[in-house]
Amino acid sequence: MRGALYIGMLSALFHLIFFSGQLQAQELRANVEINAQAATNVDPQVFQELQQAIASFLNERKWSSDNFEDFEKIECSFFINILEAKSNDQYNASLTVIANRPIYNTSYTSTLINRFDKDLTFTYKQFDPLDFNENQFINNLTHTLAFYAYFILGMDYDSYAQNGGEVYFQKAQELVNNVPSTSGFSGWRSFDNNNQNRYWLVNNVLNSRYTSFREGNYTYHRLGLDRLVDSKDTAMLSLLSGMSSFSEVGLDAPNLPIMQLLSDTKKLEWLNLFSEEKSDIKSAALKSLTTIDPNNIEEYRSRFK
């Protein structure tokens, strides 16, 4: 049970264990928005209905075997930007996925995922159901949404227990493997978008060579952020330990999709978190950031003076 991962947290932050006869609540509280300004030749009602259908797909489907109360749901957002509407009800779009986790004993949250996916092509006719089959690729839109639902769960569970999200990353990888190489949909193949794709994203996470990434996720969030209020000095050491784990991956294999995801997700948090700390803390964080996020290292140096 995911509830076991929250031992010692406030009741508003840990997962209760239900009796089998009780109602099973879903895991996600997903906000869905569609920007269709570019689709001037399509009735806006089509996108309003699609937006509602996607929200229902994400929020009403059971993605795990664990039981969640309403206040335990993972807060996340799916932003779809329609780039082109074709005459055959086909759309080219981009997708931004953001997911947050609460920080124990505070009113703050930490962003776990901030992912921009440029490869979303799908077909949708008004009133069409959003079909989905975990074992078969039948709809690129729902397949992509499901991939990110499982990836969110994997990152969330990993942040509470070492490798706690394994089963969800495995499910995300199975979705990748179910897409035929001849599908014609970009984002699933190893060579799509200069390797910044779904294939490599989940492959990186599950690769034993990069276990330090997942170790860092747990140490940084559960042993670091969650303990800042109760034991700041110890928590800060754990935060730096988590950063060091991330740095090991960046040093071993620069430009990995998971490292790009990490930098995109955590940059603002790191700037705010470490900029007011003691010089030794800032120096240690900066050392790790040199390999975690080299493209923004000058900004970190400027803020950590």
Where are these regions (language model features)?
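Positively charged n-region of N-terminal signal peptides that target proteins for export
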Residues: M1-L5
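Second-shell loop/turn segments in exported
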Residues: Q37-P44, D131-N139, L251-D252
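Acidic/His-rich structured neighborhood in mature extracellular/periplasmic domains
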Residues: D89-N203
